[in-house]
Swiss-Prot record:
Name used for this protein in its record: Uncharacterized ORF2 protein
Region listing for Disordered, in residue ranges: 46-136
Source domain of life: Viruses
Organism from which the protein derives: Torque teno virus (isolate Japanese macaque/Japan/Mf-TTV9/2000) (TTV)
Regions of compositional bias (Gly residues) in chain numbering: 99-108
Pfam families on file: TT_ORF2-like (PF02957)
UniProt-listed InterPro entries: HEV_TT_vir_Orf2/Gyrovir_Vp2_N (IPR004118)
Bias (Acidic residues): 123-136
């Protein structure tokens, strides 16, 4: 077979591009996602133990899976759980920031009377100010 081998005509960039394309294409033959690097990382992480990787065969992973106890990249940790459903009984919403006298605070008088909200006169005054600033 070595008699049939000929050196490539591609430069270094061309060889890297061809190799990258072959990795992406081979990934697409098995998977429809657009992240071959993630899957390659998973394969290398798990195959490293079986193939002897750097330093020889590796011990089995710590209980809990990859990313626990120093095993593997942190990217492979499971996602945290969703927050509690606010509609469930016993769930309390956290208090809103601000105090009783602050606009947008805990509510009370401002919430009932509408004080602290934009009035049509306030909006007209703001727009007039913007027009004056643009004229300068």
């Amino acid at each position: 077979m070595t008699n049939q081998w000929e050196p490539t005509t591609l430069n270094a960039w061309g060889r890297e591009e061809a190799w990258l394309r072959s990795v992406v294409d081979s990934h697409q033959s098995f998977c429809g996602c657009n992240d071959p690097g993630f899957h390659l990382g998973l394969l290398l992480h798990s195959a490293g133990r079986h193939l002897g990787g750097p330093g020889g065969p590796q011990p089995p992973p710590a209980p809990g899976g990859p990313g626990v106890g120093g095993e593997g990249p942190r990217r492979f940790l499971p996602l945290p759980g969703l927050p509690a459903n606010p509609e469930e009984p016993g769930h309390q919403r956290p208090p809103c920031p601000g105090g009783p006298g602050d606009a947008g605070g805990a509510g009370g008088v401002d919430a009932e009377t509408g004080e602290g909200e934009w009035r049509p006169e306030d909006i007209a005054e703001l727009l007039d100010g913007l027009e004056d600033a643009e004229k300068r």
